[in-house]
Design a protein with these regions (language model features):
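Amphipathic protein-protein interaction modules
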Residues: 57-101
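Short, compact, well-ordered microdomains
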Residues: 86-91, 95-124
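Short amphipathic beta-strand/extended segments with alternating polar/hydrophobic composition
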Residues: 18-20, 104-105, 126-129
Length: 129
């Protein structure tokens, strides 16, 4: 489930985000990227339907290209759910993303949910479906 998942952020140092738990590493990154909000996004396994590695990589590359076009700074990340049959989902921690934009990107890539984090550095699960 989304709430039990570990959301790895591959910064230096790397750290794990948990829904509902404040993360001080995130505050440091907010300062670095001059941001006060962020989102955790993936294009893997749309509508929770398991896709092949190649399909997932292709969709995630499209998301990455879009983030670059939007000039949205991001760090590579990965969502891992301990009780899921899915392998980890490559993701992006994207800085400066307003909630509406995070939802739009999640919907564009047919995700059931996204994580959104405001200035309090507490990740929130935002259900889209």
């Amino acid at each position: 489930s989304y709430t039990n998942a570990d959301y790895y952020v591959y910064s230096d140092p790397k750290f794990i985000l948990k829904i509902g738990k404040k993360n001080l590493n995130l505050i440091d990154l907010y300062q670095k990227f001059n941001a006060s909000q962020a989102s955790f996004l993936t294009a893997y396994n749309p509508m929770s339907q398991e896709m092949t590695f190649e399909q997932n990589e292709s969709m995630n590359n499209k998301l990455e290209t879009l983030l670059v076009k939007m000039n949205s700074p991001f760090i590579l990340a990965e969502g891992v759910c301990p009780e899921s049959q899915f392998p980890g989902e490559k993701s992006f921690l994207v800085f400066g993303t307003e909630l509406l934009i995070a939802k739009e990107l999640g919907n564009k890539f047919q995700q059931n949910a996204v994580l959104w984090i405001n200035k309090d550095a507490i990740p929130q699960l935002i259900l889209l479906k």
